[in-house]
């Protein structure tokens, strides 16, 4: 039954789809935008580890390069597997209906070979950087593909929470490529922040694409419980996110203050915006700031970690 629905949805979505260059097909199959954002998260964890251990960047250059390329391949593989499994609901949603696995420009069998190949190569490269990095790479890949994509995404309103654990693994990969101390407050804080950030971010996407998720029967929180419940739950996560900023106290008060201020601005925008805007405009505001939050915080962490030893 699922196969029949997939075939019908893909056929309907591919009728008027223009041809694409192979590089574009590959990019969309592997989700290069997600690869880039996750590499930034990985770099934040790696930079923190260099700072905490006091190891000069030059001494770990091979490990750094293996971690970068290994992470990119594993994250790309996760994107390929997700595209294969979700092609039926992707065909229904406007933002995903032109993905190569939907239009037929990338056949599922080819995407599967690509995903498996990149998984093996990526994990091998991470293993050269550090066995712990490879372990986290495998864990992140598994959590994203199986508990999230194949199970919770279509079954529960807590799919975002379940998926957030796998989505927060890249900083752990970067850290583990350099340091074996997995209980340091800095990396715990970075992991917690990355987990918590995802709920307000993806709730905002779910509101902006409410009709599409509803049509695809994906039980996102706003679709099942409504906007008010989503607003309340968003603010709860933002309060906890602000509190989690204090994980960085032992590392740097500067990073702590940056993380705290960003969280409080986000919370203020949420409360003030909800009172003045209709839900989709509020969600757009939340979505845009979520991107700024993570980009600014990770950039500050990377800059602080790499530049502080020079002074």
Swiss-Prot record:
Q: Where in the cell is it found?
A: Cell membrane
GO annotation, biological process? heme O biosynthetic process
What GO molecular function terms would the record report? protoheme IX farnesyltransferase activity
Q: Where are the transmembrane segments?
A: 39-59, 61-81, 111-131, 133-153, 162-182, 187-207, 246-266, 287-307
Quote the pathway field: Porphyrin-containing compound metabolism; heme O biosynthesis; heme O from protoheme: step 1/1
The record's CDD domains line, in alphabetical order, gives: PT_UbiA_Cox10 (cd13957)
InterPro entries hit by this protein: Protohaem_IX_farnesylTrfase, UbiA_prenyltransferase, UbiA_prenylTrfase_CS, UbiA_sf
Under the cellular component aspect of Gene Ontology, which terms does the record hold? Answer: plasma membrane
- Spell out the family assignment given in the record's similarity comment: Belongs to the UbiA prenyltransferase family. Protoheme IX farnesyltransferase subfamily.
Relate the assembly described in the record: Interacts with CtaA.
- What the protein does? Converts heme B (protoheme IX) to heme O by substitution of the vinyl group on carbon 2 of heme B porphyrin ring with a hydroxyethyl farnesyl side group.
Task: Please give the name of this protein.
Answer: Protoheme IX farnesyltransferase
Q: Which organism is it from?
A: Shouchella clausii (strain KSM-K16)
Gene designation: ctaB
